[in-house]
UniProtKB/Swiss-Prot annotation:
Catalysed transformations (reactions): a quinone + NADH + 5 H(+)(in) = a quinol + NAD(+) + 4 H(+)(out)
Protein name: NADH-quinone oxidoreductase subunit A
Membrane topology listed for this record: Multi-pass membrane protein
UniProt xrefs under InterPro entries: NAD(P)H_OxRDtase_bac/plastid, NADH_UbQ/plastoQ_OxRdtase_su3, NDAH_ubi_oxred_su3_sf
GN (gene name): nuoA
Length: 147
């Protein structure tokens, strides 16, 4: 590497280096300033969690239903689908009919997956007993009278 090449690289990237130095320095200044100017109260009540004016009760380790994770996965999947379709829609003139067919196949595959999930009951939030009561209300009313 010759001297002129390294000088050119430094001349080309000096503004970014100054930006990084100032940003890191500003972050450090704010952290140190908060530490020096912040309160020093150390009491037992200061170490307890407090949220929205309510004292916490019980453990923070709650077991959530797997259906919440299922909804999160569906959101991510369909959000990524929307991103792909947005990228396709911005370049529709360049991609032409081939791009349209590819996007249609992509949508068809995702819709087939959605239909499959509906058919196996992955999107059904109600328990099986409640679903049966909703489907056959007359048989359930007879069963309830016999109890």
């Amino acid at each position: 590497m010759s001297m002129s090449t390294s000088t050119e690289i430094i001349a080309h990237h000096w503004a970014f280096a100054i930006f990084l130095i100032i940003a890191i320095g500003l972050c450090c200044l704010m952290l140190v300033g908060g530490w020096f100017l912040g309160g020093r109260a150390r009491a037992r009540s200061k170490n307890t969690p407090f949220e929205s004016g309510i004292d916490s009760v019980g453990s923070a380790r709650l077991r959530l239903s797997a259906k919440f994770y299922l909804v999160a996965m569906f959101f991510v999947i369909f959000d990524v689908e929307a991103l792909y379709l947005f990228a396709w829609s911005t370049s529709i003139r360049e991609s032409g009919w081939v791009g349209f067919v590819e996007a249609a196949i992509f949508i068809f595959v995702l819709l087939a997956g959605l239909v499959y999930l509906v058919r196996i009951g992955a999107l059904d939030w109600t328990p099986a007993r409640s679903r049966r009561e909703r489907m056959n209300p007359e048989t359930n009313s007879i069963a309830n009278r016999q109890r």
